[in-house]
Amino acid sequence: MVTIRADEISNIIRERIEQYNREVTIVNTGTVLQVGDGIARIYGLDEVMAGELVEFEEGTIGIALNLESNNVGVVLMGDGLMIQEGSSVKATGKIAQIPVSEAYLGRVINALANPIDGRGQISASESRLIESPAPGIISRRSVYEPLQTGLIAIDSMIPIGRGQRELIIGDRQTGKTAVATDTILNQQGQNVICVYVAIGQKASSVAQVVTSLQERGAMEYTIVVAETADSPATLQYLAPYTGAALAEYFMYREQHTLIIYDDLSKQAQAYRQMSLLLRRPPGREAYPGDVFYLHSRLLERAAKLSSQLGEGSMTALPIVETQSGDVSAYIPTNVISITDGQIFLSADLFNAGIRPAINVGISVSRVGSAAQIKAMKQVAGKLKLELAQFAELEAFAQFSSDLDKATQNQLARGQRLRELLKQSQSAPLTVEEQIMTIYTGTNGYLDGLEIGQVRTFLVQLRTYLKTNKPQFQEIISSTKTLTPEAESFLKEGIQEQLERFLLQEKL
Protein backbone atom coordinates (compact mmCIF):
# COMPACT_ATOMS: atom_id res chain seq x y z
CA MET A 1 0.00 0.00 0.00
CA VAL A 2 1.36 3.45 -1.02
CA THR A 3 2.04 5.70 1.92
CA ILE A 4 0.82 9.24 1.49
CA ARG A 5 3.19 11.74 3.01
CA ALA A 6 1.45 14.85 4.22
CA ASP A 7 4.50 17.10 3.80
CA GLU A 8 4.80 16.17 0.08
CA ILE A 9 1.15 16.97 -0.51
CA SER A 10 1.44 20.29 1.28
CA ASN A 11 4.57 21.15 -0.78
CA ILE A 12 2.76 20.36 -4.03
CA ILE A 13 -0.24 22.45 -2.97
CA ARG A 14 2.08 25.31 -1.95
CA GLU A 15 3.86 25.21 -5.33
CA ARG A 16 0.56 25.16 -7.20
CA ILE A 17 -0.66 28.16 -5.19
CA GLU A 18 2.56 30.07 -5.94
CA GLN A 19 2.28 29.31 -9.66
CA TYR A 20 -1.42 30.16 -9.79
CA ASN A 21 -1.74 33.44 -11.64
CA ARG A 22 -5.23 34.53 -12.45
CA GLU A 23 -5.64 38.17 -13.47
CA VAL A 24 -8.94 39.73 -12.59
CA THR A 25 -10.02 42.60 -14.84
CA ILE A 26 -12.98 44.68 -13.90
CA VAL A 27 -14.69 46.17 -16.94
CA ASN A 28 -17.15 49.02 -16.59
CA THR A 29 -19.89 48.14 -19.10
CA GLY A 30 -23.27 49.43 -20.18
CA THR A 31 -26.04 48.77 -22.68
CA VAL A 32 -27.16 50.92 -25.62
CA LEU A 33 -30.68 52.23 -25.00
CA GLN A 34 -31.00 54.43 -28.06
CA VAL A 35 -28.76 55.56 -30.93
CA GLY A 36 -29.17 58.10 -33.73
CA ASP A 37 -27.96 61.49 -35.05
CA GLY A 38 -24.45 60.81 -33.78
CA ILE A 39 -25.66 60.43 -30.16
CA ALA A 40 -26.06 57.24 -28.11
CA ARG A 41 -27.85 56.87 -24.75
CA ILE A 42 -26.26 54.22 -22.56
CA TYR A 43 -27.67 52.48 -19.48
CA GLY A 44 -25.00 51.43 -16.97
CA LEU A 45 -21.38 52.68 -17.21
CA ASP A 46 -21.74 53.60 -13.53
CA GLU A 47 -18.18 54.81 -12.96
CA VAL A 48 -17.58 56.58 -16.27
CA MET A 49 -15.78 59.95 -16.16
CA ALA A 50 -16.88 63.07 -18.03
CA GLY A 51 -14.98 63.17 -21.32
CA GLU A 52 -13.93 59.49 -21.07
CA LEU A 53 -13.68 57.43 -24.24
CA VAL A 54 -16.08 54.48 -24.50
CA GLU A 55 -15.91 51.62 -27.01
CA PHE A 56 -18.94 50.03 -28.65
CA GLU A 57 -19.17 46.34 -29.53
CA GLU A 58 -18.54 46.95 -33.24
CA GLY A 59 -15.48 49.15 -32.63
CA THR A 60 -16.86 52.72 -32.80
CA ILE A 61 -15.39 55.07 -30.20
CA GLY A 62 -17.48 57.69 -28.41
CA ILE A 63 -17.01 60.38 -25.75
CA ALA A 64 -19.18 60.41 -22.63
CA LEU A 65 -20.37 64.02 -22.35
CA ASN A 66 -23.65 63.89 -20.43
CA LEU A 67 -23.63 62.00 -17.13
CA GLU A 68 -27.27 61.82 -16.01
CA SER A 69 -28.92 59.99 -13.11
CA ASN A 70 -30.28 57.11 -15.19
CA ASN A 71 -28.22 57.14 -18.41
CA VAL A 72 -25.07 58.45 -20.07
CA GLY A 73 -25.13 60.63 -23.23
CA VAL A 74 -22.30 59.67 -25.60
CA VAL A 75 -21.28 61.49 -28.79
CA LEU A 76 -19.98 59.18 -31.52
CA MET A 77 -16.68 59.63 -33.38
CA GLY A 78 -18.05 57.98 -36.50
CA ASP A 79 -21.35 57.36 -38.26
CA GLY A 80 -22.39 54.62 -35.78
CA LEU A 81 -24.51 52.86 -38.42
CA MET A 82 -23.58 49.40 -37.11
CA ILE A 83 -24.39 50.13 -33.45
CA GLN A 84 -27.48 48.22 -32.34
CA GLU A 85 -29.89 48.86 -29.52
CA GLY A 86 -29.09 46.52 -26.61
CA SER A 87 -25.45 45.99 -27.65
CA SER A 88 -22.80 46.41 -24.97
CA VAL A 89 -20.45 49.36 -24.43
CA LYS A 90 -17.32 49.41 -22.30
CA ALA A 91 -15.47 52.32 -20.69
CA THR A 92 -11.81 52.48 -21.75
CA GLY A 93 -10.47 54.46 -18.78
CA LYS A 94 -8.76 56.88 -21.22
CA ILE A 95 -9.52 60.39 -22.37
CA ALA A 96 -9.03 61.59 -25.95
CA GLN A 97 -5.37 61.74 -26.94
CA ILE A 98 -3.40 61.72 -30.18
CA PRO A 99 0.08 60.56 -31.20
CA VAL A 100 2.53 63.44 -31.89
CA SER A 101 5.89 63.60 -33.66
CA GLU A 102 7.96 65.53 -36.21
CA ALA A 103 6.74 63.01 -38.83
CA TYR A 104 3.39 64.86 -39.02
CA LEU A 105 5.02 67.78 -40.89
CA GLY A 106 3.86 67.92 -44.50
CA ARG A 107 0.88 65.62 -43.87
CA VAL A 108 -2.91 66.01 -43.99
CA ILE A 109 -4.66 64.32 -41.05
CA ASN A 110 -8.12 64.15 -39.48
CA ALA A 111 -9.22 65.04 -35.93
CA LEU A 112 -8.05 61.65 -34.63
CA ALA A 113 -4.57 62.31 -36.13
CA ASN A 114 -5.02 59.57 -38.76
CA PRO A 115 -3.53 60.46 -42.17
CA ILE A 116 -6.05 61.18 -44.94
CA ASP A 117 -3.59 62.06 -47.71
CA GLY A 118 -3.02 58.44 -48.83
CA ARG A 119 0.70 58.53 -48.04
CA GLY A 120 0.77 55.75 -45.45
CA GLN A 121 0.83 55.67 -41.65
CA ILE A 122 2.72 58.19 -39.51
CA SER A 123 5.13 56.82 -36.91
CA ALA A 124 4.98 58.47 -33.48
CA SER A 125 6.37 57.40 -30.12
CA GLU A 126 4.79 60.13 -27.96
CA SER A 127 1.17 61.11 -27.39
CA ARG A 128 -0.56 64.23 -26.05
CA LEU A 129 -4.00 64.81 -24.61
CA ILE A 130 -6.31 66.59 -27.05
CA GLU A 131 -7.56 68.79 -24.19
CA SER A 132 -4.67 69.96 -22.04
CA PRO A 133 -4.53 72.95 -19.68
CA ALA A 134 -3.21 76.27 -20.99
CA PRO A 135 0.11 77.61 -19.61
CA GLY A 136 -0.35 79.60 -16.39
CA ILE A 137 0.71 83.20 -15.73
CA ILE A 138 4.17 82.25 -14.43
CA SER A 139 4.79 80.01 -17.46
CA ARG A 140 4.34 82.92 -19.89
CA ARG A 141 6.22 86.04 -20.84
CA SER A 142 4.96 89.07 -22.72
CA VAL A 143 4.95 89.05 -26.51
CA TYR A 144 8.04 90.75 -27.94
CA GLU A 145 9.02 89.07 -31.24
CA PRO A 146 7.20 89.91 -34.48
CA LEU A 147 5.38 87.33 -36.58
CA GLN A 148 5.50 88.77 -40.08
CA THR A 149 2.46 88.03 -42.23
CA GLY A 150 3.95 89.47 -45.42
CA LEU A 151 0.92 91.79 -45.82
CA ILE A 152 1.80 95.49 -45.56
CA ALA A 153 -1.55 96.55 -44.05
CA ILE A 154 -1.20 94.04 -41.19
CA ASP A 155 2.53 94.23 -40.45
CA SER A 156 2.50 98.04 -40.37
CA MET A 157 -0.80 98.93 -38.68
CA ILE A 158 -2.13 95.76 -37.00
CA PRO A 159 1.15 93.97 -36.14
CA ILE A 160 1.10 90.43 -34.76
CA GLY A 161 3.64 89.11 -32.23
CA ARG A 162 4.69 85.53 -31.57
CA GLY A 163 2.36 84.13 -28.92
CA GLN A 164 -0.52 86.48 -29.74
CA ARG A 165 -4.11 85.55 -30.68
CA GLU A 166 -5.39 87.69 -33.53
CA LEU A 167 -8.90 87.14 -34.87
CA ILE A 168 -9.56 87.33 -38.63
CA ILE A 169 -13.23 88.25 -39.01
CA GLY A 170 -15.42 89.03 -42.01
CA ASP A 171 -18.28 87.91 -44.23
CA ARG A 172 -18.02 84.92 -46.53
CA GLN A 173 -15.87 85.46 -49.64
CA THR A 174 -13.86 88.38 -48.25
CA GLY A 175 -10.44 86.69 -48.35
CA LYS A 176 -10.11 85.44 -44.74
CA THR A 177 -8.46 82.15 -45.72
CA ALA A 178 -6.21 84.02 -48.17
CA VAL A 179 -4.83 86.20 -45.34
CA ALA A 180 -4.16 83.06 -43.28
CA THR A 181 -2.50 81.09 -46.10
CA ASP A 182 -0.35 84.11 -47.10
CA THR A 183 0.86 84.22 -43.49
CA ILE A 184 1.84 80.53 -43.72
CA LEU A 185 3.71 81.17 -47.01
CA ASN A 186 5.59 84.06 -45.39
CA GLN A 187 6.96 81.78 -42.64
CA GLN A 188 9.26 80.09 -45.16
CA GLY A 189 12.80 80.17 -43.74
CA GLN A 190 11.57 81.77 -40.49
CA ASN A 191 11.76 78.51 -38.50
CA VAL A 192 8.04 78.56 -37.68
CA ILE A 193 5.93 75.37 -37.72
CA CYS A 194 2.42 76.02 -39.11
CA VAL A 195 -0.78 74.09 -38.36
CA TYR A 196 -3.84 74.78 -40.53
CA VAL A 197 -7.11 73.43 -39.11
CA ALA A 198 -10.02 73.26 -41.58
CA ILE A 199 -13.39 72.82 -39.82
CA GLY A 200 -16.58 71.99 -41.71
CA GLN A 201 -15.31 73.26 -45.07
CA LYS A 202 -15.85 71.84 -48.55
CA ALA A 203 -13.26 69.15 -49.33
CA SER A 204 -12.50 71.03 -52.58
CA SER A 205 -11.57 74.21 -50.64
CA VAL A 206 -9.21 72.27 -48.36
CA ALA A 207 -7.63 70.55 -51.40
CA GLN A 208 -7.10 73.97 -52.98
CA VAL A 209 -5.28 75.27 -49.87
CA VAL A 210 -3.11 72.13 -49.65
CA THR A 211 -2.22 72.37 -53.37
CA SER A 212 -1.27 76.05 -53.10
CA LEU A 213 0.94 75.30 -50.06
CA GLN A 214 2.58 72.35 -51.85
CA GLU A 215 3.29 74.37 -55.01
CA ARG A 216 5.16 77.00 -53.00
CA GLY A 217 7.07 74.54 -50.81
CA ALA A 218 5.19 75.50 -47.64
CA MET A 219 3.96 71.99 -46.77
CA GLU A 220 7.48 71.11 -45.53
CA TYR A 221 6.81 73.05 -42.31
CA THR A 222 2.98 72.73 -42.24
CA ILE A 223 0.48 70.21 -40.84
CA VAL A 224 -3.11 70.31 -42.15
CA VAL A 225 -5.88 69.01 -39.86
CA ALA A 226 -9.09 68.65 -41.88
CA GLU A 227 -12.63 67.70 -40.94
CA THR A 228 -14.82 68.53 -43.92
CA ALA A 229 -18.52 69.40 -44.02
CA ASP A 230 -19.55 65.73 -44.28
CA SER A 231 -17.67 64.73 -41.09
CA PRO A 232 -19.62 63.90 -37.91
CA ALA A 233 -20.23 66.94 -35.65
CA THR A 234 -18.07 65.35 -32.91
CA LEU A 235 -15.00 65.32 -35.14
CA GLN A 236 -15.61 68.90 -36.33
CA TYR A 237 -15.80 69.91 -32.66
CA LEU A 238 -12.54 68.06 -31.83
CA ALA A 239 -10.44 69.18 -34.83
CA PRO A 240 -9.24 72.53 -33.35
CA TYR A 241 -8.12 70.81 -30.13
CA THR A 242 -6.19 68.23 -32.17
CA GLY A 243 -4.44 71.06 -34.03
CA ALA A 244 -3.66 72.81 -30.73
CA ALA A 245 -2.19 69.59 -29.26
CA LEU A 246 0.14 69.23 -32.27
CA ALA A 247 1.20 72.90 -32.09
CA GLU A 248 1.79 72.58 -28.32
CA TYR A 249 4.08 69.59 -28.88
CA PHE A 250 6.40 71.84 -30.93
CA MET A 251 5.93 74.85 -28.61
CA TYR A 252 7.14 72.89 -25.56
CA ARG A 253 10.15 71.77 -27.61
CA GLU A 254 11.34 75.41 -27.80
CA GLN A 255 10.01 76.00 -31.32
CA HIS A 256 7.73 78.71 -32.72
CA THR A 257 4.35 77.64 -34.07
CA LEU A 258 1.48 79.32 -35.90
CA ILE A 259 -2.00 77.78 -35.80
CA ILE A 260 -4.95 78.80 -37.94
CA TYR A 261 -8.51 77.73 -37.08
CA ASP A 262 -10.65 78.03 -40.21
CA ASP A 263 -13.22 78.64 -38.92
CA LEU A 264 -14.54 78.71 -35.35
CA SER A 265 -18.12 79.59 -36.39
CA LYS A 266 -18.40 76.09 -37.90
CA GLN A 267 -16.97 74.52 -34.74
CA ALA A 268 -19.54 76.39 -32.62
CA GLN A 269 -22.32 75.16 -34.93
CA ALA A 270 -21.10 71.55 -34.60
CA TYR A 271 -21.01 71.95 -30.81
CA ARG A 272 -24.51 73.47 -30.84
CA GLN A 273 -25.77 70.47 -32.83
CA MET A 274 -24.22 68.03 -30.33
CA SER A 275 -25.55 69.94 -27.32
CA LEU A 276 -29.11 70.20 -28.63
CA LEU A 277 -29.16 66.48 -29.46
CA LEU A 278 -27.89 65.77 -25.94
CA ARG A 279 -30.87 67.87 -24.74
CA ARG A 280 -28.75 70.49 -23.02
CA PRO A 281 -30.70 73.73 -22.50
CA PRO A 282 -30.17 76.21 -25.36
CA GLY A 283 -29.17 79.83 -24.72
CA ARG A 284 -28.67 82.85 -27.00
CA GLU A 285 -28.95 81.94 -30.73
CA ALA A 286 -29.64 78.34 -29.49
CA TYR A 287 -25.97 77.90 -28.53
CA PRO A 288 -25.37 76.10 -25.22
CA GLY A 289 -24.33 78.09 -22.14
CA ASP A 290 -20.70 76.93 -22.27
CA VAL A 291 -19.95 77.98 -25.86
CA PHE A 292 -17.70 80.78 -24.53
CA TYR A 293 -15.66 78.18 -22.63
CA LEU A 294 -15.48 76.10 -25.82
CA HIS A 295 -13.41 78.84 -27.48
CA SER A 296 -11.66 80.36 -24.46
CA ARG A 297 -10.05 77.08 -23.41
CA LEU A 298 -8.86 76.58 -26.99
CA LEU A 299 -7.43 80.06 -27.56
CA GLU A 300 -5.83 80.36 -24.11
CA ARG A 301 -3.48 77.55 -25.16
CA ALA A 302 -1.70 80.03 -27.46
CA ALA A 303 1.18 81.55 -25.51
CA LYS A 304 4.71 82.89 -25.48
CA LEU A 305 6.50 80.64 -22.97
CA SER A 306 8.90 81.93 -20.32
CA SER A 307 12.68 81.47 -20.60
CA GLN A 308 12.53 78.61 -18.04
CA LEU A 309 10.27 76.68 -20.45
CA GLY A 310 12.44 77.42 -23.48
CA GLU A 311 10.73 80.53 -24.95
CA GLY A 312 8.69 78.53 -27.49
CA SER A 313 5.53 80.19 -28.79
CA MET A 314 2.16 79.38 -30.30
CA THR A 315 0.46 82.15 -32.27
CA ALA A 316 -3.23 81.62 -33.02
CA LEU A 317 -5.14 83.15 -35.94
CA PRO A 318 -8.76 82.09 -35.42
CA ILE A 319 -11.18 82.89 -38.25
CA VAL A 320 -14.84 83.77 -37.63
CA GLU A 321 -17.45 84.30 -40.34
CA THR A 322 -20.01 87.08 -39.88
CA GLN A 323 -23.44 87.40 -41.49
CA SER A 324 -23.67 90.66 -43.51
CA GLY A 325 -21.04 92.42 -41.41
CA ASP A 326 -22.75 91.86 -38.05
CA VAL A 327 -19.84 91.86 -35.58
CA SER A 328 -22.23 92.02 -32.61
CA ALA A 329 -23.58 88.47 -33.04
CA TYR A 330 -22.91 85.94 -30.28
CA ILE A 331 -19.86 84.02 -31.56
CA PRO A 332 -18.03 87.07 -33.05
CA THR A 333 -18.37 89.06 -29.78
CA ASN A 334 -17.23 86.04 -27.75
CA VAL A 335 -14.11 85.48 -29.82
CA ILE A 336 -13.32 89.22 -30.03
CA SER A 337 -13.33 89.36 -26.22
CA ILE A 338 -11.00 86.32 -25.95
CA THR A 339 -8.42 87.39 -28.56
CA ASP A 340 -5.74 90.11 -28.46
CA GLY A 341 -7.16 92.03 -31.40
CA GLN A 342 -8.99 91.52 -34.68
CA ILE A 343 -8.43 92.02 -38.39
CA PHE A 344 -11.77 93.00 -39.90
CA LEU A 345 -12.27 92.18 -43.59
CA SER A 346 -14.98 94.16 -45.33
CA ALA A 347 -17.09 92.91 -48.25
CA ASP A 348 -17.47 96.49 -49.58
CA LEU A 349 -13.70 97.00 -49.77
CA PHE A 350 -13.28 93.56 -51.35
CA ASN A 351 -15.85 94.37 -54.04
CA ALA A 352 -14.21 97.76 -54.62
CA GLY A 353 -11.00 95.92 -55.55
CA ILE A 354 -9.09 96.75 -52.36
CA ARG A 355 -7.48 93.41 -51.53
CA PRO A 356 -6.59 92.32 -48.88
CA ALA A 357 -9.91 93.96 -47.88
CA ILE A 358 -8.74 95.04 -44.41
CA ASN A 359 -10.81 97.74 -42.74
CA VAL A 360 -7.97 99.51 -40.92
CA GLY A 361 -10.40 101.76 -39.02
CA ILE A 362 -11.91 99.03 -36.83
CA SER A 363 -9.06 96.50 -36.89
CA VAL A 364 -6.79 96.53 -33.83
CA SER A 365 -3.85 94.65 -32.38
CA ARG A 366 -3.72 94.92 -28.60
CA VAL A 367 -0.23 93.56 -27.95
CA GLY A 368 1.47 93.41 -31.33
CA SER A 369 2.99 96.91 -31.31
CA ALA A 370 5.47 95.72 -28.68
CA ALA A 371 6.68 93.16 -31.21
CA GLN A 372 7.17 95.54 -34.16
CA ILE A 373 10.75 96.19 -35.24
CA LYS A 374 11.95 99.78 -34.74
CA ALA A 375 12.33 100.45 -38.48
CA MET A 376 8.67 99.56 -39.07
CA LYS A 377 7.54 101.73 -36.14
CA GLN A 378 9.46 104.65 -37.66
CA VAL A 379 7.54 104.52 -40.94
CA ALA A 380 4.17 103.05 -39.86
CA GLY A 381 3.11 105.86 -37.49
CA LYS A 382 2.84 108.38 -40.31
CA LEU A 383 1.00 105.88 -42.55
CA LYS A 384 -1.64 105.22 -39.88
CA LEU A 385 -2.22 108.92 -39.26
CA GLU A 386 -2.44 109.87 -42.95
CA LEU A 387 -4.86 107.03 -43.73
CA ALA A 388 -7.10 108.02 -40.80
CA GLN A 389 -7.16 111.66 -41.99
CA PHE A 390 -7.83 110.50 -45.55
CA ALA A 391 -10.82 108.38 -44.47
CA GLU A 392 -12.28 111.40 -42.67
CA LEU A 393 -11.65 113.77 -45.59
CA GLU A 394 -13.04 111.33 -48.14
CA ALA A 395 -16.38 111.29 -46.33
CA PHE A 396 -16.54 115.12 -46.41
CA ALA A 397 -15.27 115.40 -49.99
CA GLN A 398 -18.39 113.60 -51.25
CA PHE A 399 -20.52 116.59 -50.23
CA SER A 400 -18.39 119.54 -51.39
CA SER A 401 -17.21 120.12 -54.93
CA ASP A 402 -14.74 123.01 -54.46
CA LEU A 403 -11.84 121.84 -52.29
CA ASP A 404 -8.73 123.88 -51.56
CA LYS A 405 -5.35 122.76 -52.90
CA ALA A 406 -4.12 121.33 -49.56
CA THR A 407 -7.21 119.15 -49.20
CA GLN A 408 -6.91 117.95 -52.81
CA ASN A 409 -3.26 117.03 -52.19
CA GLN A 410 -4.17 115.17 -49.02
CA LEU A 411 -6.89 113.22 -50.85
CA ALA A 412 -4.48 112.38 -53.68
CA ARG A 413 -1.86 111.19 -51.16
CA GLY A 414 -4.47 109.06 -49.36
CA GLN A 415 -5.55 107.38 -52.60
CA ARG A 416 -1.93 106.47 -53.37
CA LEU A 417 -1.37 105.14 -49.86
CA ARG A 418 -4.45 102.97 -50.21
CA GLU A 419 -3.07 101.74 -53.53
CA LEU A 420 0.27 100.71 -52.00
CA LEU A 421 -1.54 98.58 -49.40
CA LYS A 422 -3.04 96.42 -52.17
CA GLN A 423 -1.33 93.08 -52.68
CA SER A 424 -1.90 90.05 -54.89
CA GLN A 425 -2.71 86.75 -53.22
CA SER A 426 0.26 84.49 -52.41
CA ALA A 427 2.75 87.34 -52.87
CA PRO A 428 3.95 88.16 -49.34
CA LEU A 429 6.62 90.86 -48.96
CA THR A 430 9.67 90.83 -46.69
CA VAL A 431 9.76 93.42 -43.90
CA GLU A 432 12.50 95.38 -45.74
CA GLU A 433 10.32 95.59 -48.87
CA GLN A 434 7.38 96.75 -46.75
CA ILE A 435 9.42 99.51 -45.06
CA MET A 436 10.67 100.72 -48.43
CA THR A 437 7.12 100.70 -49.89
CA ILE A 438 5.60 102.65 -46.97
CA TYR A 439 8.48 105.17 -46.92
CA THR A 440 7.98 105.84 -50.65
CA GLY A 441 4.27 106.55 -50.11
CA THR A 442 4.38 108.63 -46.91
CA ASN A 443 7.24 110.84 -48.15
CA GLY A 444 5.36 111.97 -51.25
CA TYR A 445 7.38 110.14 -53.91
CA LEU A 446 4.20 108.64 -55.39
CA ASP A 447 2.27 111.93 -55.52
CA GLY A 448 3.48 112.70 -59.05
CA LEU A 449 2.35 109.34 -60.43
CA GLU A 450 -1.07 108.35 -61.74
CA ILE A 451 -2.94 105.94 -59.43
CA GLY A 452 -2.75 103.21 -62.08
CA GLN A 453 1.06 103.52 -62.22
CA VAL A 454 1.67 103.13 -58.46
CA ARG A 455 1.79 99.33 -58.26
CA THR A 456 3.93 98.93 -61.41
CA PHE A 457 6.39 101.50 -60.06
CA LEU A 458 6.60 99.82 -56.65
CA VAL A 459 7.31 96.39 -58.18
CA GLN A 460 10.12 97.89 -60.28
CA LEU A 461 11.45 99.84 -57.27
CA ARG A 462 11.72 96.68 -55.15
CA THR A 463 13.70 94.92 -57.89
CA TYR A 464 15.92 97.99 -58.43
CA LEU A 465 16.75 98.38 -54.73
CA LYS A 466 17.46 94.67 -54.34
CA THR A 467 20.01 94.71 -57.16
CA ASN A 468 21.48 98.23 -56.89
CA LYS A 469 21.16 99.14 -53.19
CA PRO A 470 21.57 95.84 -51.29
CA GLN A 471 23.13 97.81 -48.40
CA PHE A 472 19.63 99.10 -47.46
CA GLN A 473 18.30 95.59 -46.82
CA GLU A 474 21.51 94.58 -45.01
CA ILE A 475 21.30 97.52 -42.59
CA ILE A 476 17.59 96.93 -41.84
CA SER A 477 18.01 93.17 -41.28
CA SER A 478 21.07 93.60 -39.04
CA THR A 479 20.11 96.70 -36.97
CA LYS A 480 16.26 96.46 -37.27
CA THR A 481 16.36 100.28 -37.46
CA LEU A 482 15.97 102.78 -40.30
CA THR A 483 19.35 104.47 -39.70
CA PRO A 484 20.25 107.77 -41.45
CA GLU A 485 22.63 105.72 -43.64
CA ALA A 486 19.85 103.29 -44.68
CA GLU A 487 17.53 106.25 -45.30
CA SER A 488 20.04 107.91 -47.63
CA PHE A 489 20.47 104.64 -49.62
CA LEU A 490 16.69 104.40 -49.84
CA LYS A 491 16.24 108.03 -50.97
CA GLU A 492 18.91 107.63 -53.66
CA GLY A 493 17.31 104.41 -54.92
CA ILE A 494 13.80 105.92 -55.04
CA GLN A 495 15.01 109.07 -56.86
CA GLU A 496 16.99 107.07 -59.44
CA GLN A 497 14.14 104.62 -60.10
CA LEU A 498 11.55 107.44 -60.26
CA GLU A 499 13.57 109.24 -62.95
CA ARG A 500 13.97 105.98 -64.93
CA PHE A 501 10.27 105.17 -64.58
CA LEU A 502 9.05 108.61 -65.72
CA LEU A 503 11.44 108.44 -68.67
CA GLN A 504 10.05 105.01 -69.66
CA GLU A 505 6.47 106.30 -69.40
CA LYS A 506 7.24 109.23 -71.73
CA LEU A 507 8.68 106.95 -74.42
Curated annotation (Swiss-Prot):
It comes from the Eukaryota. The modification Phosphothreonine is found at residue 257. InterPro entries: ATP_synth_asu-like_sf, ATP_synth_asu_C, ATP_synth_asu_C_sf, ATP_synth_F1_a_nt-bd_dom, ATP_synth_F1_asu, ATPase_a/bsu_AS, ATPase_F1/V1/A1_a/bsu_N, ATPase_F1/V1/A1_a/bsu_N_sf. It is found in: Plastid, Chloroplast thylakoid membrane. It catalyses: ATP + H2O + 4 H(+)(in) = ADP + phosphate + 5 H(+)(out). Pfam families: ATP-synt_ab (PF00006), ATP-synt_ab_C (PF00306), ATP-synt_ab_N (PF02874). It is an enzyme of class 7 (translocase). The keyword Acyltransferase does not apply. The record marks 363 as: Required for activity. Gene3D superfamilies: 2.40.30.20, ATP synthase alpha/beta chain, C-terminal domain (1.20.150.20), P-loop containing nucleotide triphosphate hydrolases (3.40.50.300). Keywords: ATP synthesis, ATP-binding, CF(1), Chloroplast, Hydrogen ion transport, Ion transport, Membrane, Nucleotide-binding, Phosphoprotein, Plastid, Thylakoid, Translocase, Transport. It is a peripheral membrane protein. GO terms for molecular function: ADP binding; ATP binding; proton-transporting ATP synthase activity, rotational mechanism. One of its GO terms (cellular component) is chloroplast thylakoid membrane. Its EC number is 7.1.2.2. Its main location: plastid. ATP binds at residues 170-177. F-type ATPases have 2 components, CF(1) - the catalytic core - and CF(0) - the membrane proton channel. CF(1) has five subunits: alpha(3), beta(3), gamma(1), delta(1), epsilon(1). CF(0) has four main subunits: a, b, b' and c. Produces ATP from ADP in the presence of a proton gradient across the membrane. The alpha chain is a regulatory subunit. NCBIfam families: atpA, PRK13343.1. Belongs to the ATPase alpha/beta chains family. This is ATP synthase subunit alpha, chloroplastic. The gene is atpA.
